[in-house]
UniProtKB/Swiss-Prot annotation:
Name the record gives this protein: 23S rRNA (uracil(747)-C(5))-methyltransferase RlmC
PANTHER family xref list: RNA M5U METHYLTRANSFERASE, TRNA (URACIL(54)-C(5))-METHYLTRANSFERASE
One GO term (biological process): rRNA base methylation
Binding residues for [4Fe-4S] cluster: 3, 11, 14, 87
Binding site for S-adenosyl-L-methionine: 212, 241, 262, 307
Protein encoded by which gene: rlmC
Swiss-Prot/TrEMBL catalytic activity: uridine(747) in 23S rRNA + S-adenosyl-L-methionine = 5-methyluridine(747) in 23S rRNA + S-adenosyl-L-homocysteine + H(+)
Molecular functions per Gene Ontology: 4 iron, 4 sulfur cluster binding; iron ion binding; rRNA (uridine-C5-)-methyltransferase activity
Record Pfam families: tRNA_U5-meth_tr (PF05958)
């Protein structure tokens, strides 16, 4: 992938950009094999990759510069701003949105937040695109609601320029810290969720729900999990740390009883909407802490699927699963180091199958799917 920003030394986010994709995959596979070296692995599946550029469905832009000439991108460690509108990880459809947002920021009088001076209002622009219909969700992250009336007044101009903006919100983040969003979300459109579709499964994206940033690879990850589950004798399963329900909704059948657990209520609202559309009555989603939910249960299903954040599932859940011993565990991880640590805490299980998914090209990061079977 060619990147003018990297070549000019202005952005170093894609640290592996000079390596061809096959070399990147080899290095990631070697890293994963090294982390799992202590465990016998029955089957190593071929790694899955997607496009090497234009694959991201989301942009998180720090807003800097002046209200007349805003910059959308990032701040270097020394506070110097960098405009990243030309980043080749973004699809071509993002360029006209960035181009319209710059004059809009001036029209609405949204003064960019100055980190050094702790002044200004507009902190971030968050943009997400649906692959299914090209609809977009735009979020303005503001320090306060001071400019809200001005933004509302100027909004019709932006909506006229960009009819693809289906969901528009303001998020209030009052704290002087590098935190992407606050708790308060104010909807400026009637529509509150973005419709997405992977492998004929309807998914919904709401402002404060996590969603994978590489749809081409994420859809293959979900389809693979579905294939693995279909090969197992399973009538009942849990989907822990389920997010908007991507795994559970793919794995569910009219015959499988499935419970999805996720702490974020916004994500659970998305999952419930999808389940209703699919007409799956034996599928239920609840907004709870996954570890607390599981460890309070007196019995476990045949299969527990976990998709934890980077920190892994942790010792309390590992201990519970070791004691209760479900026949199968499918572990989806964005941090193979913590996954390996967790597997070490599950000595009663062997690794049946492992597959690497290159969700984050040009970086050392990757996603991995592992099937564990009770010995």
């Amino acid at each position: 992938m060619q990147c003018a920003l990297y070549d000019a030394g202005r952005c170093r986010s894609c640290q592996w950009i000079t390596q061809p994709i096959p070399e990147q995959l080899s290095a990631k596979t070697a890293d994963l094999k090294n982390l799992l070296a202590d465990f016998p692995v029955e089957e190593w599946c071929a790694p899955v990759s997607g496009p090497e550029q234009g694959f991201r469905n989301k942009a998180k832009m720090v807003v800097s510069g002046s209200v007349e000439k805003p910059l959308l991108g990032m701040l270097h460690r020394d506070g110097t701003p960098e405009d990243l509108c030309d980043c080749p990880l973004y699809p071509a459809s993002f360029a006209p949105v960035f181009a319209a947002l710059k004059p809009f920021i001036a029209r609405a009088g949204l003064t960019p937040y100055n980190v050094a001076r702790k002044r200004g209002e507009l902190k971030y622009i968050l943009l997400t695109e649906s692959q299914s219909d090209g609809g977009m969700m735009l979020r303005f992250v503001l320090r306060s609601d001071t400019k809200l009336a001005q933004l509302r007044k100027a909004l019709p101009w932006l909506q006229e320029q960009l009819p693809q903006l289906k969901v528009i919100t303001v998020n209030i983040q009052p704290v002087h810290m590098a935190i992407m969003e606050g708790e308060t979300e104010i909807y400026l459109t009637e529509q509150q969720a973005l419709a997405e579709r992977f492998n004929d499964v309807p998914l919904w994206i709401r402002p404060q729900s996590f969603f994978q940033t590489n749809p081409a690879v994420a859809s293959q990850l979900y389809a693979t999990a579905r294939d693995w589950v279909r090969q197992l004798p399973v009538n009942h399963m849990w989907d822990l740390f389920c997010g908007v329900g991507g795994f559970g909704l793919h794995c569910a059948t009219p015959d499988i009883q499935l419970t999805g657990i996720e702490i974020a209520p916004e994500a659970i609202a998305c999952a419930k909407q999808s389940a209703a559309e699919l007409g799956l009555t034996r599928l239920q989603f609840q907004a709870l802490d996954s570890t607390q939910f599981a460890t309070a249960q007196g019995e476990v299903p045949e299969l527990v699927l976990v998709n934890p954040p980077r920190r892994g599932i942790g010792i309390p859940l590992c201990d519970y699963l070791s004691t209760m011993a479900p026949r199968f565990i499918i572990y989806s991880s964005c941090n193979a180091q913590t996954m390996a640590k967790d597997i070490r805490e599950l000595p009663g299980y062997r690794i049946e199958r492992v597959q690497l998914f290159d969700m984050f090209p040009h970086t050392a990061h990757y996603e991995v799917l592992t099937l564990l079977v009770k010995q």
